[in-house]
Design a protein with these regions (language model features):
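Catalytic cores of transferase enzymes with a strong primary signal for eukaryotic protein kinases
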Residues: 69, 99, 106-154, 178-179
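Single conserved hydrophobic/aromatic residue that forms the stacking wall/gate
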Residues: 1-8, 12
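Carbohydrate-binding surface patches
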Residues: 79-82, 87-89, 125-166, 196, ...
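Aromatic/acidic polysaccharide-binding cleft in carbohydrate-active enzymes
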Residues: 13-113
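Active/binding-pocket-proximal capping segment
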Residues: 96-98, 104, 108, 162-171, ...
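Catalytic cores of secreted or luminal carbohydrate-active enzymes
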Residues: 77-123, 195-222
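Extracytoplasmic
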Residues: 156, 167-173, 181-346
Length: 346
């Protein structure tokens, strides 16, 4: 386990996996809502660095130490769906009964201990709320875990198209916090959540849909660190106009400073139109490589004056199953990336 803050610069790089199986991502937790919210915020866009027996450690659990009941549900539920190590940080001889019941919730613990070991990632961010999802039980299966998370201080309305979750047909739902089945949904999931609350769901669809959109914030960035010791370090940055409210900035400039998506899925393979949405800027180039094949070099990505986002479309060939897409620019800066979408060429 890596806990020294000086070591956390390494924690999201491949070499850390040779040292430990988990790493702290933040300063120490406190039994306060602001601390819980801060740590979740730190981990929202680090899913690419978890899995395969290695995890982002969100620190010990402060259940039973003064948080409100709904805040404790957020705390434990989000630690579970994000596959954080679970370490009890309270006195079990004095813990309130309701808090102890939450800690003993077998369905949430099973979610945390799911054999796939994946961390949920953000697929939607609207109205101050976040929607996170991950595969459980079987990769690319029909069962997924979903969190509707409202960190704000007011009521939040959620409207989540099932296509965003890659789920088709009638979808069965179970509330893992309350441990009860909910009415099945089809088309769109609509919910209203109070402040500082979460809804953790096990969802089972009739059909698993092929993904269409891949956000930049899902990508693995080998040069990323969050210590803030160097200027112009590649990072996940907020952008209101971006499809998921985030972009990847400071991409390129050297060969190793790339963004990589290693689970770009195609059911049957074939030719696709890939449309990259980016922030236009003068003197930027973008190199795209799929499955280590010959790269595609895009130039003249300046766009027009005042343009917030621009897009460019290329044709790529995908193999059946998972594909690796890498974007960067070895000799100059690349544009900031919002997302890319895929459309099968018939």
């Amino acid at each position: 386990h890596l806990c020294d803050r000086r070591q956390r610069q390494m924690c999201i790089r491949d070499r850390a996996k040779n040292i430990g199986c988990s790493w702290r991502i933040s300063s120490d937790i406190r039994p306060e809502w602001g601390s819980v919210k801060y740590i979740i915020d730190k981990n929202l866009y680090l899913s690419a660095y978890a899995g395969d027996g290695h995890y982002n450690d969100m620190d010990m659990l402060e259940i039973g130490r003064g948080l409100k009941p709904e805040e404790e549900e957020v705390h434990f539920g989000m630690w579970c769906i994000m596959s954080s190590p679970l370490l009890i940080g309270c006195d079990l001889t004095t813990i309130p009964e309701a808090s102890l019941k939450l800690l003993k919730n077998k369905e949430l613990i099973a979610l945390n201990q799911d054999p796939l070991g994946l961390q949920a990632y953000v697929v939607q961010h609207e109205n101050k709320g976040y929607v996170l999802v991950k595969d459980i039980e079987q990769e690319r299966g029909k069962v997924r875990a979903v969190a509707l998370y409202n960190p704000s201080d007011s009521i939040c309305d959620f409207s989540v198209p099932m296509s965003v979750l890659e789920m088709g047909g009638k979808v069965k739902m179970r509330d893992l916090v309350k441990q009860k089945d909910l009415k099945a949904v089809q088309g769109t999931l609509n919910r209203q959540l109070p402040a500082h609350s979460v809804l953790i769901l096990r969802m089972e669809a009739e059909q698993r849909l092929e993904p269409v959109r891949y956000e930049a914030e899902w990508a693995y960035l080998p040069c990323f660190n969050d210590l803030g010791l160097r200027p112009k370090t590649i990072l996940y940055a907020p952008m209101k106009e971006a499809s998921g409210g985030m972009k990847v900035s400071y991409l390129g400039g050297r060969a190793e400073n790339y963004a990589e998506w290693n689970k770009v899925y195609s059911e049957k393979g074939g030719m696709y139109e890939m449309t990259i949405q980016y922030v236009p800027h003068a003197d930027r180039k973008l190199e795209i490589r799929v499955n280590n094949e010959k790269s595609i070099l895009l130039k003249d990505l300046a766009g027009t004056d005042g343009q917030q986002l621009a897009s460019v479309t290329v044709q790529v060939r995908l193999k059946p199953g998972n594909n690796v897409v890498r974007m960067g620019s070895p000799y100059c800066w690349a544009p900031d990336i919002d997302c890319f979408t895929l459309k099968k060429i018939e």
